[in-house]
Amino acid sequence: MRLICAIILLFIISSCGGGGSSPGNSSNDTNTDENSTQPCSPYQSGIGAGSTFTCLIEHDNIIRQFYIYVGSTYTSNSSILFSLHGYTSRGLWNMNYTGFQSIADQEGFIVIYPQGTLLPSTGQTHWNVGGWTTGSTTDDVGFINEIIEFIDDEYSIDKSRIYSTGMSNGGYMSYKLACDLSSKIAAVVSVTGSMTPETFDSCSPTHATSIAQIHGLQDSVVNNYGSLWSKPIEEVIDFWMSFNNCSETPETIEINGINGGGIHNIYSNCDNQTSVELFLMTNMGHDWPNFDNHDIQASTTVWDFLSKYNINGLID
């Protein structure tokens, strides 16, 4: 893998410097250039008490970017969370609206915010998942795998606790990782995403995998009942319930609140004590929900779910 470091401008103005030592960088000099051999540069996000870095790697002859947030309480044997942006979006925007930094500071894990590439047919950022992204030749699964290898080289991580979550297209990509990078992904949560027919039809994980779906009945972008390029949420849940050999009848918990509430279905008695869970919110649209305008807080819900599992199932 050829690593390239640069201080970049990607649709926004970024400033680098300060904030601790960079992975692969023993120097305090952050004035690097395109010829530097350093893989990452400190990035002043102004969010969280930990350290943020911006990194560039070359994968499949394309320069790819990702951000690393190292929680302030990071120690050895840390878990890894990939947080994937939606279609037309940016990794930095995802960093801002998810707010995983504060949770990472408390729990001591590392968050990775990768950046998708431009879909040639639309000129919009995307993850290659089939469906409406058909025609893309970007190897996003390989890109995520290469990030994992890089992080494993630079940090002390627990390779049995690598997770993915994402909004919309990022949720679709998280499911694709659970299918196509199953040997490394322990569990995933999709927020307002689903599975494309291509992912659904070819999915063959190597182990029982805990998954959760957070979705709104008012979502007009990724309809709960599916579309030509998106499987209905019920079919997605049924797929994972069947693959994990879960009980077919869920425990249903009502989610009460001032914004319409919802239901939380839990499918248990699955292989390796994994679980399949659905949070279906009555008045939620195509959003990353929080308590300000919904009756669920996505980021804490995501971490509370994922952190219970490793690649072998429920953590004892």
Question: PLM features: what roles do these ranges have?
Answer:
Residues 16-80, 92, 96, 106, ...:
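A domain-start/cap signature at the N-terminus of enzymes
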Residues 218-222, 286-288:
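Acidic catalytic loop of the alpha/beta-hydrolase fold
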Residues 220-232:
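Conserved alpha/beta-hydrolase "acid-adjacent" motif
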Residues 1-9:
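Sec-dependent signal peptide recognition
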Residues 82-84, 191, 281:
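Alpha/beta-hydrolase
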Residues 213-215:
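Short beta-strand/loop motif that positions the catalytic acidic residue
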Residues 56-163, 172-176, 180, 202, ...:
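Serine-hydrolase catalytic machinery in alpha/beta-hydrolase-like enzymes
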